[in-house]
Every structure is written in C-alpha cells, then in structure tokens.
C-alpha cells in the first residue's frame, strides 16, 4: 500500500460460527483496492443484525470463507483511492452503504441497486468494518459533513 497505509492491519476475525467466543483479534493483510474502489480507515462500525445472524450461522453464509471479518456498517476516512474514482478525495470522512449492486441487472440499470438480483453485502460477501481498514466501491460511500 502507498500513502502511509500499512501492509497489515488488526481485525476482529470470525473463526467459526457461534457466539462472541469465536471472535479473535488477529493480524491480516490490509485489503487491496481495485479500480473504482476506496480504502477507508475505520473510525466506527455498528453491530448489525446481519453481523449477529452471520456469526450465529443463520442467513446466507454458504460461501463464507473463514476467518472472516464482519461489520457491515462502517464509517471512517478515505486513505487510498483506486483508478477511475473522481467523486471521493483522500481525507474525506465517509459513511459506507453496505449493499453492493452488480450494476448489470435490470434494477441496477434503473438506479435501484437495493433490488439487485445479485446483491452483495459488506461484512458478508466481502470483508467488513470490524478492522482497521475496509475496501469498498466508491459508489458506496457518502461524505459526512465536517
């Protein structure tokens, strides 16, 4: 990573399904960002219903690879920007929208990505915000006024 972002970070790792006793703090690689993505240094994250369902083994966890990082409602500061990102700047304070549309199906093309046929969620389909950093699509962040 560039710009002072460390190669590794601390994260709260889900090691198996169960209760809080299956969570462990560990050192993992800081997520890379791709084109159209940003890296957010997490300042706050909620414990959502999706997090508790995933942790307990309920819900759609078939493809979950362990260890996993929960936390589907993070907020923080943008510290790295991927190619093609123009609406977000380094240092922006942002809140992250957890649902990620595919941008290809009919609802997404109509601007209704919450009805996406291939909807993914931060903290479920990709690592979430119970970590020092989280990578997310730039379209999923909203600036927090200062």
Features from the language model and the residues they span:
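Residue-level signal for short segments within beta-strands and strand-turn junctions
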Residues: 13-16, 56, 78, 109
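N-terminal Sec signal peptide and the immediately downstream disordered periplasmic leader
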Residues: 1-3, 36
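Cytochrome P450 core scaffold surrounding the K-helix E-X-X-R motif
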Residues: 49-56
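Short structural boundary motif marking the start of a folded domain
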Residues: 5-12
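NAD(P)H dinucleotide-binding glycine-rich loop of Rossmann-like/cofactor-binding domains
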Residues: 100-146
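Short glycine/threonine/proline-enriched tight-turn/helix- or strand-capping micro-motif at secondary-structure
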Residues: 20-29
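Glycine-rich beta-strand-centered segment in the early N-terminal region that forms part
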Residues: 29-46, 58-106, 140, 145
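Short, solvent-exposed secondary-structure boundary/capping segments
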Residues: 52, 87, 116-117
């Amino acid at each position: 990573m560039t710009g002072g972002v460390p190669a590794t970070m601390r994260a709260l790792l889900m090691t198996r399904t169960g209760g809080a006793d299956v969570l462990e703090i560990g050192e993992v690689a800081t997520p890379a960002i791709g084109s159209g993505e940003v890296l957010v240094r997490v300042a706050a994250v909620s414990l959502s219903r999706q997090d508790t369902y995933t942790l307990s083994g309920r819900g759609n966890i078939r493809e979950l690879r362990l260890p996993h990082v929960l936390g589907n409602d993070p907020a923080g500061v943008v510290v790295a920007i991927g190619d093609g990102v123009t609406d977000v700047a380094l240092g922006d304070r942002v809140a992250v929208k957890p649902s990620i549309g595919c941008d290809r199906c009919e609802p997404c093309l109509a601007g209704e990505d919450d009805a996406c046929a291939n909807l993914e969620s931060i903290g479920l389909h990709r690592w979430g915000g119970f970590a020092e950093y989280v990578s997310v699509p730039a379209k999923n962040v909203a600036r927090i006024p200062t």
